[in-house]
């Protein structure tokens, strides 16, 4: 396998495993925890390989500007994600299905913690490796935005988030996009736990 093929493979693998397990396993707290754990076990060596052999995460900029840009854009995406829910037209036309379930609030606290950590620190990073590290190079900016949008039930704000994360990856580096996505998912999870707006999960 060539260096490029290896780099592409480890960029795709964590997200592919996450999606495969999501499709194949039932939507239960236990299966979500298993999916998070398996993906994390795969994600960590993939991140190490990309950084150690190719420097694709931390290239061409210092850490502090990436952190600032990532946090700012991440919080902006959070606001964009939550704010439109108040409008009937948005809930009718811009959300697939029922827009989430309220059953999560009946789950055990352990599951809530796993859900928060999995969303913030596992799937967000796996998505950035797949969409911004690999797919955007292969398919281009706008097709990546479109595919990122349809992956989410809230497709309109998903598209906006995809544009912002993609812009960060291009202008500030992949690490900045990862920090933004982690910030959004972590802050959204804390918002859900605080307010009980379980539809966002």
Give the positions of each predicted feature.
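Juxtamembrane/transmembrane-helix boundary motifs at the membrane-water interface
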Residues: 19-31, 92-94, 190-201
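Structural signal for membrane-spanning alpha-helices in multi-pass inner-membrane proteins
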Residues: 22, 26, 39-50, 77, ...
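Juxtamembrane helix-loop-helix connectors linking adjacent transmembrane helices
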Residues: 54-124, 136-137
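Short, Lys/Arg-rich, polar N-terminal cytosolic tail immediately upstream
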Residues: 1-5
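Alpha-helical transmembrane segments in multi-pass membrane proteins
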Residues: 6-53, 59-74
